[in-house]
Amino acid sequence: MRENIGVIWLREDFRLLRNYALINANKNHKKLIAVYAYKEKKFIDKKGQKWWVYKSLKNFKKDLDDYNITLQVIKTDTYKSFFEKLIKIKNISLYWNRIYEPAYLTFDKYLEKKLKFHKIDYKIFKGNVLNEFNDVKKNDNTPFKVFTPFWRVAEKIHIEKVPSPDTKI
């Protein structure tokens, strides 16, 4: 168990089961903090989304409290400014689940470079997908172009990896 603090960056994954960032941080750290970076500009014209995030965070906080994990919602203008502050805290390990939209993937690459430069431990896990992009390939190691053969292989891989439904952090 590491003495430093495990920080789980919450993005769109407010669940305990199969939340690989949360599960791995919990295995490796005595103290955990879950952080949601709230960008107010993101929700200006999206009252429904804002309501959903509020309710989801409120419910998720109750779940995290059962495991003595603190949830902090931090208001920020940009993810960059949020992480500039976070990087100044040296005694942390950062965990998050990937989001597969281009802007998020680009930011993840930027953040990885920053964290490496500042020698901050981090781990990224698959998000809300059954398989990562490169997990499912044909025998010749090239990507599938037809769905049915892809699904047969993906299903086989997924069935082998599924944890028990009663597995909790």
Predicted region positions:
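Substrate/cofactor-recognition hotspot
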Residues: 161-169
